[in-house]
Curated annotation (Swiss-Prot):
Protein name: Large ribosomal subunit protein uL3
Summary of the function given for this chain in its UniProt record: One of the primary rRNA binding proteins, it binds directly near the 3'-end of the 23S rRNA, where it nucleates assembly of the 50S subunit.
Keyword entries, A-Z: Methylation, Ribonucleoprotein, Ribosomal protein, RNA-binding, rRNA-binding
Lineage: Bacteria, Pseudomonadati, Pseudomonadota, Gammaproteobacteria, Oceanospirillales
GO terms, molecular function: rRNA binding; structural constituent of ribosome
Protein origin, superkingdom: Bacteria
Post-translational modification as stated in the protein's UniProt record: Methylated by PrmB.
């Protein structure tokens, strides 16, 4: 295990190098220890943002704030046709929960020492989040 002081950690932070400590190896093979690992697959979850409207979730335009729109300028508008289909089609962009989705990223390892990985990539999720990494 290596110890990193705050100055070194700040240097890596400025260079956008992220430090990961491997907590647990799942079915880790000793075969990988003899070779240089250049790529890993990271599986992580994005930040959850809760229930959001269509303006934030799907980048819809807002209506006029004046001319009679006092409360409904951030609403969806029309969702479907008239009597002919009589329903709203599937995959319609509507309000709902945003974020907390699973992401898979292929990341090149910048530097590896013992059980620390230094990666140069912007990763989704919150700080101190647990990521799942698969060696390729």
């Amino acid at each position: 295990m290596i110890f990193i002081n705050k100055g070194t950690k700040h240097f890596f932070y400025k260079k956008k190098l992220y430090i990961f400590n491997v907590i647990k190896f799942s079915k880790f093979n000793k075969f990988y220890l003899n070779f240089i690992i250049n790529k890993i697959l990271l599986i992580c979850y994005s930040k959850g943002k809760g229930f959001q409207g269509v303006v934030k979730r799907w980048n819809f335009k807002t209506k006029d704030k004046s001319h009679g729109n006092s409360l409904s300028y951030r609403t969806l508008g029309s969702t479907g046709q008239c009597q002919d289909p009589g329903r709203v089609f599937k995959k319609k962009k509507m309000p709902g929960r945003m974020g907390n989705k699973k992401f898979s990223l292929f990341v090149n390892i910048f530097f590896r020492k013992k059980n620390y990985f230094f990666l140069k990539k912007i990763l989704p999720g919150v700080k101190n989040d647990i990521l799942l990494g698969k060696i390729l």
